[in-house]
Design a protein with these regions (language model features):
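A contiguous, basic/glycine-rich beta-loop/short-helix subdomain that forms a polymer-engagement track
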Residues: 1-21
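Short conserved beta-strand segments at catalytic cores or DNA/RNA-binding microdomains
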Residues: 21-24, 34-41
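Short acidic, Gly/Ser-rich segments with clustered Asp/Glu that frequently serve as metal-coordination loops
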Residues: 26-30
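Extended hydrophobic-aromatic, low-complexity segments
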Residues: 31-34, 238-239
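Active-site proximal loops enriched in glycine and acidic residues that flank catalytic Cys/His/Asp
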Residues: 35-37, 90, 113, 217, ...
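Extracellular low-complexity, Gly/Ser/Thr-rich intrinsically disordered linkers
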Residues: 194-243
Length: 262
């Protein structure tokens, strides 16, 4: 992982790539959001990881998440990019997620639900229409939901993290990073990197005696008492962002690409 930190001569908050997506994970006391930039061949750049304190029962948390939809980040070539699409996990407080997504607009926001197993042929399915609640009133088929084979995207992320970065000599000769390469900024925290790779793929035996592959967390707690579950959220947020790049990759210029840096 250190090669990623060394190879990137740019800092958190600065864009590269063609467009941005984000993945949001909702928990009891916070909402975590990872913003990624995407280039050709699913090459990606971590732009920023944001922790919104307060959780889904705090309206200010949703307001802060909404504000991210209108925020822009400076591109290395001078323009400014906004989030084209944001995926938000519905595993916790789904009704609150649906209500927020309805208000924010499904054109930019997609509630997602992770499903078990590997489905490489169709890792993303939907959208399906589910009931939602708005101001205490049930809205039939009021929200759109995408189902995601998260294990497939996690495997893809780990495979991309193992790709070798081009050497200085390669770059001088005109070479670029291989398709799928994950660029991490030079000021990314070491703890964040550890949390991105906080799981491993293992073979487990089911109650019926069958074997299957399953992602399991590596780190239960660190010295500061950080639950292993929280460590997994960085990978979940990355997976959500990948989903949005797959589901609704902008055709032509990204939504905010034309905004000049004034």
């Amino acid at each position: 992982m250190q090669r990623h930190l060394r190879e990137a001569a740019w800092c958190i908050g600065t864009c590269n790539g063609l467009f941005l997506t984000a993945g949001a994970d909702v928990q009891k006391d916070r909402i975590e959001v990872s913003i990624w930039a995407w280039g050709r061949g699913l090459t990606s750049w971590l732009i920023e990881h944001i922790v919104i304190e307060g959780g889904p029962k705090r309206q200010a948390s949703w307001d802060e998440l909404t504000s991210l939809l209108g925020r822009t980040w400076p591109h290395v070539h001078g323009a400014r990019l906004g989030i084209a699409k944001l995926a938000v996990d519905t595993g916790y407080q789904a009704s609150a997620v649906y209500a927020w997504a309805r208000g924010a607009g499904f054109a930019q926001v997609a509630p997602v639900k992770g499903v078990e197993g590997f489905n490489r042929a169709a890792p993303v399915a939907g959208p399906s229409f589910v009931d939602a609640t708005e101001r205490g009133r049930k809205v039939r088929r009021g929200a759109r939901l995408w189902t995601v084979a998260v294990a497939t995207f996690k495997s893809e992320t780990y495979r991309y993290l193992r790709l070798a970065a081009p050497t200085d000599e390669d770059i001088a000769a005109g070479a670029t990073a291989p398709p799928g390469f994950i660029h991490l900024p030079q000021d990314a925290e070491a703890e964040w990197i550890k949390q991105l790779v906080a799981e491993q793929l293992v073979t487990v035996t089911t109650r019926r005696g069958f074997q299957k592959l399953e992602w399991q967390k590596l780190r239960e707690r660190n010295g500061a008492g950080l639950p292993g579950l929280r460590a997994r959220r960085r990978l979940d947020c990355r997976s959500g962002s990948v989903v949005r790049s797959e589901v609704a990759r902008p055709r032509g210029p990204a939504r905010a690409c034309a905004r000049p840096n004034r």
